[in-house]
């Protein structure tokens, strides 16, 4: 069983509509869609936006469906200036950009008693990288950071880049999903696409290009599933 998590309806609808033998159940107000995609058993959920929603949905998915792996799909704001709208983002590490326990000796972004970063499954990273090469998509592997704020100003962007110079993108759920997977020992990877450049025009860009990002990330996830 492959678990696929997206925060927004636009981020999961494309994949959901491709399921055969579709079945829907609801647990704690979270909807799960099970079916067959590319001859693989999958379960797709729309988690809702933000870290708490993401952690709840991931926990429910793992407990109910016992997935072998989890893929987080959707959109993200680019922090790397070489990225453009529609480019595919593949996580190697994910971190929180809004966690601060440095007073107790932890690194900025680190949750106490948790790793500094949550590492994606290396075999999954390799599989996704092969897929994007086959599809001739522009993609980047790197650090994705998460927090409970939409990054829509130059000031917000600069603050994150100062704290995490190597971060390529920012969004609102991936690290919570990753932490949950870490605690349940479930391999994961984040496969998102750029919807905006996390700057003063981010809100306009996000609304205009969310669909493009959703198509790009969904196509990549579908191709990945076919290879698993």
From Swiss-Prot:
Keyword Hydrolase: yes
Keyword terms: Amino-acid biosynthesis, Hydrolase, Methionine biosynthesis
Source superkingdom: Bacteria
Active-site residues, as the UniProt record annotates them: 11 (proton acceptor), 196 (proton donor)
One Pfam family hit: PNP_UDP_1
Reactions it catalyzes: S-adenosyl-L-homocysteine + H2O = S-(5-deoxy-D-ribos-5-yl)-L-homocysteine + adenine; S-methyl-5'-thioadenosine + H2O = 5-(methylsulfanyl)-D-ribose + adenine; 5'-deoxyadenosine + H2O = 5-deoxy-D-ribose + adenine
Molecular function terms, GO-annotated: adenosylhomocysteine nucleosidase activity; methylthioadenosine nucleosidase activity
One GO-annotated biological process of the protein: L-methionine salvage from S-adenosylmethionine
EC number from the UniProt entry: 3.2.2.9
Pathway annotation from the record: Amino-acid biosynthesis; L-methionine biosynthesis via salvage pathway; S-methyl-5-thio-alpha-D-ribose 1-phosphate from S-methyl-5'-thioadenosine (hydrolase route): step 1/2
Function according to Swiss-Prot or TrEMBL: Catalyzes the irreversible cleavage of the glycosidic bond in both 5'-methylthioadenosine (MTA) and S-adenosylhomocysteine (SAH/AdoHcy) to adenine and the corresponding thioribose, 5'-methylthioribose and S-ribosylhomocysteine, respectively. Also cleaves 5'-deoxyadenosine, a toxic by-product of radical S-adenosylmethionine (SAM) enzymes, into 5-deoxyribose and adenine.
Family to which the UniProt record says this protein belongs: Belongs to the PNP/UDP phosphorylase family. MtnN subfamily.
HAMAP family, per database record: Salvage_MtnN
Protein name: 5'-methylthioadenosine/S-adenosylhomocysteine nucleosidase
Native organism: Staphylococcus aureus (strain bovine RF122 / ET3-1)
Gene expressing this chain: mtnN
């Amino acid at each position: 069983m492959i678990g696929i998590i997206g925060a927004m309806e636009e981020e999961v609808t494309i994949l959901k509509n491709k399921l055969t033998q579709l079945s829907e159940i609801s647990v704690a107000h979270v909807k799960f869609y099970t079916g067959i995609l590319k001859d693989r058993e999958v379960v797709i959920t729309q988690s809702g936006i933000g870290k708490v929603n993401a952690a709840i949905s991931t926990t429910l998915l793992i407990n109910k469906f016992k997935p072998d792996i989890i893929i987080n799909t959707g959109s993200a704001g680019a922090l790397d200036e070489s990225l453009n709208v529609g480019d595919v983002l593949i996580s190697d590490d994910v971190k929180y950009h809004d966690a601060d326990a440095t007073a107790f000796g932890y690194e900025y972004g680190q949750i106490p008693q948790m790793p500094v970063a949550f590492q994606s499954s290396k075999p999954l990273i390799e599989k996704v990288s092969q897929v994007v090469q086959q599809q001739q998509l522009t993609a980047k592997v790197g650090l994705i950071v998460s927090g409970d704020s939409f990054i829509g100003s130059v000031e917000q962007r600069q603050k994150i880049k100062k704290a995490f110079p190597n971060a390529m993108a920012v969004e609102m759920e991936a690290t919570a999903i990753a932490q949950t997977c870490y605690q349940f020992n479930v391999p994961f990877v984040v496969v998102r696409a750029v919807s905006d450049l996390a700057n003063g025009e981010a809100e306009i860009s996000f609304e205009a290009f969310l669909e493009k990002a959703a198509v790009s990330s969904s196509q990549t996830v579908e191709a990945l599933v076919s290879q698993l």
